[in-house]
């Protein structure tokens, strides 16, 4: 694990910084693996130029597996972001012990505990991606010492069953101080979506769109290498 490896890679990236999510299941679209080897998809993401890898460990809604997260961290030199509904500091420690580089902390879940969870994660060498969906949540997030703030274009409270779009990034990202790395999450399916996202954010996190296609390497490469004016 490289300390704060994800935020550093985003800052140094010379192409479009895309965090590619290895998403095995979606409450909206169902099975996204469709019999494919997840490690082969990882290799495709690496070849396409992903700036980092994201994996959801939640088993209930997204059918994630923490043991596979640990394996991912060993299989790739890219920084790996753990996404889950984290509510205990023990989960943060487990993430660091597994070799993770970053952890998602959801403002809506943690509320007034958010600052101490951010500090705890950073003490363990983890980047923190503090997730927001509303202006009220953003006001809380910018008071923390997080390295990154993520704008979830979809409502995680609805388990991504809503049709979010990058207009929320356009609305909230300009309000985030420059000391934070800004990440646009979810709802990015086309090059036009990506252009809007990266006009306002420093990086984009894309999962479903990549997993739904038969050739995730080709699509991701087109996103990474696209000219963003």
Curated annotation (Swiss-Prot):
Q: For this protein, what is the EC number?
A: 4.1.1.48
Cross-referenced Pfam families: IGPS (PF00218)
Provide any one GO MF term from the record. phosphoribosylanthranilate isomerase activity
UniProt keyword Amino-acid biosynthesis, yes or no:
yes
Q: In which pathway does it act?
A: Amino-acid biosynthesis; L-tryptophan biosynthesis; L-tryptophan from chorismate: step 4/5
Q: Where is the signal peptide?
A: none
Q: What class of enzyme is it?
A: lyase
Coiled-coil boundaries:
none
Enumerate the catalysed reactions: 1-(2-carboxyphenylamino)-1-deoxy-D-ribulose 5-phosphate + H(+) = (1S,2R)-1-C-(indol-3-yl)glycerol 3-phosphate + CO2 + H2O
GO biological process, any:
L-tryptophan biosynthetic process
Keywords for the protein's UniProt record, in alphabetical order: Amino-acid biosynthesis, Aromatic amino acid biosynthesis, Decarboxylase, Lyase, Tryptophan biosynthesis
Q: Does the keyword Amino-acid biosynthesis apply?
A: yes
InterPro entries with a match to the protein in the record: Aldolase_TIM, Indole-3-glycerol_P_synth, Indole-3-glycerol_P_synth_dom, Indole-3-GlycerolPSynthase_CS, RibuloseP-bd_barrel
User: Can you tell me which family this protein belongs to?
Assistant: Belongs to the TrpC family.
Instruction: Cite the HAMAP family for this sequence.
Output: IGPS_A
Q: Which NCBIfam families match?
A: PRK00278.2-3
Stated name of the protein: Indole-3-glycerol phosphate synthase
Task: Report the gene name.
Answer: trpC
């Amino acid at each position: 694990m490289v300390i704060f490896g994800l935020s550093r890679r985003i800052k140094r990236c010379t192409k479009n910084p895309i965090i590619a999510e290895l998403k095995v299941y979606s409450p909206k679209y169902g099975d996204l693996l469709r019999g494919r080897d997840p490690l082969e998809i990882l290799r495709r993401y690496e070849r396409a130029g992903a700036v980092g890898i994201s994996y959801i460990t939640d088993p209930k809604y997204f059918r994630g597996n923490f043991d596979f997260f640990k394996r991912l961290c060993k299989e790739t030199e890219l920084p790996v972001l753990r996404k889950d509904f984290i509510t205990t500091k023990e989960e943060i420690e487990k993430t660091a012990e597994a070799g993770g580089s970053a952890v998602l902390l959801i403002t809506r879940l943690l509320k007034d505990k958010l600052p101490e969870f951010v500090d705890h994660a950073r003490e363990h060498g983890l980047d923190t991606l503090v997730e927001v969906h509303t202006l009220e949540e953003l006001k809380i997030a910018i008071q923390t010492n997080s390295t990154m703030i993520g704008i979830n274009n979809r409502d995680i409270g609805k388990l991504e069953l809503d049709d979010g779009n990058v207009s929320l990034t356009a609305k909230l990202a300009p309000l985030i101080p420059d000391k934070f790395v800004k990440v646009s999450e979810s709802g990015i399916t086309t090059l036009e979506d990506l252009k809007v996202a990266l006009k306002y954010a420093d990086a984009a996190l894309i999962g479903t769109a990549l997993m739904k296609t038969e050739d995730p390497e080709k699509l991701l490469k087109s996103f990474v290498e696209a000219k963003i004016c």
